[in-house]
């Protein structure tokens, strides 16, 4: 059987979502570990006045591609930008570009999707479902196509507690929903959205479930596989540990915790935190395309790319490692010392929100106003609470995913491919991974230099001293007010003080008698 690099040798590959987090890592890994890949076509839209080619050039100049550029200085010549807008009819692609792709593409990786949990149903359907269908129509015309890989999510069927590696019946016929959306106005769509998504938490998981069904139905004549990653996090090993470049998912919460802004969150300490490193997802995806391309299985394979079943990690452990890492290696200009309390109790959660989030933010904004600056902390807290609300469904529940196909895929790799395209999460050491993840947010998201650590530690110690001083003054003031108004409190206070003096006198007397 061909090795994975041999399979990709001489192949033309198409990637959607190549400028996204996972797409970048997929592109880098493909070019670096399969150096004889002929060309990689990436669908990119115009953005902020930049042409697709300029966006790709800028992307490939970032730190993620440093190792690739060192090994293959001319690697950028293999990457061909195709102007495309996935939300437009026929992907807004020129006839010339369509003909090029139809004539030469061997492998398709469809990674593009909206990952915003609060996206409107219309927009989520457009990118996650309709764009997928249009890409499948284009793929059906490709003369040399060997395999089509659709990247979904392990939470597409989160309304089930036990999730098999199969495509489940959709909650509604995608075709009928698409037709209905054409005549509905936005107000009506928003009104019916809660009824449509039912027991799913958001439009993202709902539309990803519909997209899987579309892939199964519309791509029945194609050689297709689906990869379902869970919560995609920073890189484990490749191209280096801790690579992360966005605030999405848990990354933004980790940063908020490190800054001392996030103090409480609704979550179950014992719920499984099914984090999956991005390089594990990429290696699984490349291996899935190899297996389907070489063996051409009769049925479409689905791979649940998760960690909970083989190497479980819990949200309570996540909280511990995040806080301990940021206490040792603090972020610059922290608002408060890192400390987070996870709770699943509704009343306790709202109490801590008021005491630990809103009250300090309000006081800080008052201080900013007094000093002539613009208040900003309450706005930050409001944005943080929105993000927390979107994630609490996933931090409060656990799921069981079947991983038989993923384990089978791993067993089919040669010893060399297992080293180069490793996705065995049993080898993942969570404490080390979480430290690299947190440090990755510091270095690559916030762009903080490690040389600034001494100053950051000094600032954290200053915050600790301020906290101790404030708490001491607060306790003394409250106690003094309480004593002044209550005879019983005064009696207790005098009794405690007298007992302390008696104890000290006894201690001194006993010490003197020894000599």
From Swiss-Prot:
Molecular function (Gene Ontology), one example: alcohol-forming very long-chain fatty acyl-CoA reductase activity
Catalytic activity: a long-chain fatty acyl-CoA + 2 NADPH + 2 H(+) = a long-chain primary fatty alcohol + 2 NADP(+) + CoA; hexadecanoyl-CoA + 2 NADPH + 2 H(+) = hexadecan-1-ol + 2 NADP(+) + CoA; octadecanoyl-CoA + 2 NADPH + 2 H(+) = octadecan-1-ol + 2 NADP(+) + CoA; (9Z)-octadecenoyl-CoA + 2 NADPH + 2 H(+) = (9Z)-octadecen-1-ol + 2 NADP(+) + CoA
PANTHER family referenced in this protein's UniProt entry, alphabetically: FATTY ACYL-COA REDUCTASE 1, MALE STERILITY PROTEIN 2-RELATED
Stretches that traverse the bilayer: 466-484
Leader peptide range in chain numbering: none
Protein name: Fatty acyl-CoA reductase 1
Any Gene Ontology biological process: wax biosynthetic process
Biological source species: Xenopus laevis (African clawed frog)
GO-annotated cellular components: peroxisomal membrane; peroxisome
CDD domains: FAR-N_SDR_e, FAR_C
Pfam families assigned: NAD_binding_4, Sterile
Gene name of this polypeptide: far1
Family: Belongs to the fatty acyl-CoA reductase family.
EC nos: 1.2.1.84
Enzymatic class: oxidoreductase
Cytoplasmic side: 1-465
Family matches, as InterPro entries: FAR, FAR_C, Far_NAD-bd, NAD(P)-bd_dom_sf
Location in the cell: Peroxisome membrane
């Amino acid at each position: 059987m061909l090795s994975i690099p041999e399979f990709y040798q001489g192949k033309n590959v198409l990637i959607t979502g190549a400028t996204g987090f996972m797409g970048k890592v997929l592109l880098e890994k493909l070019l670096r570990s399969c150096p004889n890949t002929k060309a990689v076509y990436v669908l990119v839209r115009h953005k902020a006045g930049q042409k697709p080619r300029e966006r790709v050039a800028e992307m490939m100049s970032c730190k993620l591609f440093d190792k690739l550029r060192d090994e293959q200085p001319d690697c950028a010549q293999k990457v061909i930008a195709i102007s495309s807008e996935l939300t437009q009819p026929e992907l807004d692609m020129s006839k010339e570009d369509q003909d090029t792709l139809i004539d030469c593409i061997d492998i398709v990786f469809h990674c593009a999707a909206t990952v915003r949990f609060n996206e409107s149903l219309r927009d989520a359907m457009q990118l996650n479902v309709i764009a997928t269908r249009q890409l499948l129509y284009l793929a059906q015309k490709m003369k040399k196509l060997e395999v089509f890989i659709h990247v979904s999510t392990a939470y597409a069927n989160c309304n089930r507690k036990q999730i098999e590696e199969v495509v489940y019946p959709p909650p509604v016929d995608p075709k009928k929903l698409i037709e209905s959306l054409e005549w509905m106005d936005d107000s009506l769509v928003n009104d019916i959205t809660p009824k449509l998504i039912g027991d799913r938490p958001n439009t993202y998981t709902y539309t990803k479930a519909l997209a899987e069904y579309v892939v199964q139905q519309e791509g029945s004549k194609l050689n297709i596989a689906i990869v379902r990653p869970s919560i995609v996090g920073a890189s484990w090993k490749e191209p280096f540990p801790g690579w992360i470049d966005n605030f999405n998912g848990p990354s933004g919460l980790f940063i908020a915790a490190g800054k001392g802004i996030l103090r409480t969150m609704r979550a179950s300490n014992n719920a499984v935190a099914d984090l999956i490193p991005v390089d594990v997802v990429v290696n699984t995806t490349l291996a899935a395309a190899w297996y389907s391309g070489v063996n051409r299985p009769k049925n479409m394979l689905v791979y649940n790319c998760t960690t909970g079943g083989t190497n479980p990690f819990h949200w309570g452990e996540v909280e511990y490692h995040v806080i301990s890492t940021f206490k040792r290696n603090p972020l610059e200009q922290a608002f408060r010392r890192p400390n987070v309390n996870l709770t699943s109790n509704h009343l306790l959660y709202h109490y801590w929100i008021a005491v630990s989030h809103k009250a300090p933010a309000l006081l800080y904004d008052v201080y900013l106003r007094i000093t002539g600056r613009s208040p900003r902390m309450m706005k930050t807290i409001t944005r943080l609470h929105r993000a927390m609300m979107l994630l609490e469904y996933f931090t409060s529940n656990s799921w069981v995913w079947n991983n038989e196909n993923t384990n089978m895929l791993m067993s089919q790799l040669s010893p060399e491919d297992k080293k180069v395209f490793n996705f065995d999460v049993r080898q993942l050491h969570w404490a080390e991974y979480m430290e690299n993840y947190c440090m990755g947010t510091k270095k690559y998201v916030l762009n903080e230099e490690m040389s600034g650590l001494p100053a950051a530690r000094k600032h954290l110690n200053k915050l600790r001293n301020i906290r101790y001083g404030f708490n001491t003054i607060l306790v003394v003031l409250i106690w003094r007010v309480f004593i002044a108004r209550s005879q019983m409190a005064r009696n207790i206070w005098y009794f405690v003080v007298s007992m302390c003096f008696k104890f000290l006198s006894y201690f001194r007397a006993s010490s003197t008698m020894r000599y």
